[in-house]
Amino acid sequence: MISISTMLKGLFLLDPRPYDWIYGAEVRQQIHELVDVYAPLQTRPTVAENPALLGEAEVILSGWGCPQFTEELLAFLPRLRAVFYGAGSIRGIVTEAFWARQIPITTATVANGVPVSEFTIAHIILGLKRYWQHVQRFRETGEWWEHLPVAGAYGSTVGLVSLGTIGQMVAERLKSYEVNVIAYDPFVTQETAAALGVRLCSLEQVFRQADVVSLHTPWLPETEGLITGAHFAAMKEGATFINTARGAVVREAEMIAVLQQRPDLYALLDVTYPEPPAADSPSMRLPNVTISPHIAGALQDECLRNGQSMVEELKRFLNGEPLRYAISRERAARMA
């Protein structure tokens, strides 16, 4: 154990519930052995009430509920040397003032992406079997032996829209299956795609050729409404659409219109826009739409992976090693 006198001073700064989820007892114990956590958990309300308490903090361990690092807040953090954010996107917490200070920030984006990729793979395989349609048909008719046409997980085609952190995780996991993987991502090189076992093509080709299309595009001004009704109308007979990214990337009204006309298609939506969807939204009633309440990412004990990821990053920082998951200003701008 490092001597208290030589430890950097640190604080936990996030909401109470994610604090318990991300930084469980075992994770907190490891952190307390590495840094001098000199005050109890801090939240946005406690910081607003007593910002001077931040003055000694050299490292901050955070997550969902972290306040934005504004110029005003940073004025109370003169000794801050690094931020360890045990969740995903940091777009909502970083500012120009933060980047101007050149403070390293690392995140649990990769750890948080693991359950999303697992969730997606499960949906892909079930989608290739048209599982939900078969369940619904059996409930309605009792028919056991008459199966719908299925693509199956042999020689079928899976389409990925965007090959960011999670899209690449999904592609890696799909190597275990005998399926063809195509993807649209204008920022990915042919070399990267080849290493992932993916063939790059246009967005239109992904929707036309894939038996299952999985969306992994971050919600940015330039991607809002990227997926249109024309894309859905072009999908193969019996194809499945999965969205674990952000609802606003899809033009929902156009999607719904096509799904109403094409009962052979199926949409699995873990995200909507807005969230939750309006009670009178047609998507809540369509038989070929299943909505889950944004559960693909890390939940409850799964969040401990995020915390452990931050422990390992903290060790690297204290040892003077490069941070494995550090986020640059440029990358932060492309995060969801």
Task: Put a short name on every predicted segment.
Residues G65, G88, D211, T217-W219, ...:
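Short glycine-/small-residue-rich Rossmann-like dinucleotide-binding loops
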Residues G86-A87, P104-A111, L203-E204, A245, ...:
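Short beta->alpha connector loops at strand-helix junctions that form conserved
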Residues I103, A108-T157, M169-E172:
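Phosphate-binding beta-alpha-beta segment of Rossmann-like dinucleotide-binding domains, i.e.
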Residues I105-T106, G229, E237-A336:
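Rossmann-like dinucleotide-binding domain for NAD(H)/NADP(H)
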